[in-house]
């Protein structure tokens, strides 16, 4: 009588994969809402590239971050047909 026994207590490993990792989110997007009061230097919008363009009293940093250059109220506006901009107008 011939018996075919298989033992799995010392089975070889399953190898590795090229997947299995991910990077943390970069926390991009709007940091202040339309109509919100801001101070000089406040970050308004974090972005990669120019999704939104700087308007009145708004500067653009080296990483394309938009920030307030004066105290006032935030306004998200259309710029032409297919572009958007953010401006800061002095509070009355």
Curated annotation (Swiss-Prot):
GO terms for biological process: translation. GO terms for molecular function: structural constituent of ribosome. GO terms for cellular component: cytosolic large ribosomal subunit. It comes from the Bacteria. Residues 11-30 are annotated as: Disordered. Residues 1-8 form a propeptide. Keywords: Ribonucleoprotein, Ribosomal protein. The N-terminus is cleaved by ribosomal processing cysteine protease Prp. The keyword Ribonucleoprotein applies. Belongs to the bacterial ribosomal protein bL27 family. HAMAP family: Ribosomal_bL27. This is Large ribosomal subunit protein bL27. It comes from Lactiplantibacillus plantarum (strain ATCC BAA-793 / NCIMB 8826 / WCFS1).
């Amino acid at each position: 009588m011939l018996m075919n026994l298989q033992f799995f207590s010392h089975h070889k490993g399953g190898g590795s994969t090229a997947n299995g990792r991910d990077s943390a989110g970069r926390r991009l997007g709007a940091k202040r809402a339309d109509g919100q009061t801001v101070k000089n230097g406040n970050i308004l919008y974090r972005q990669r590239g120019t999704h939104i363009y700087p308007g009145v009293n708004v500067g653009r940093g080296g990483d394309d971050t938009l920030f307030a250059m004066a105290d006032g109220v935030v306004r998200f506006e259309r710029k032409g047909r297919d572009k958007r901009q953010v401006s800061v107008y002095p509070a009355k």
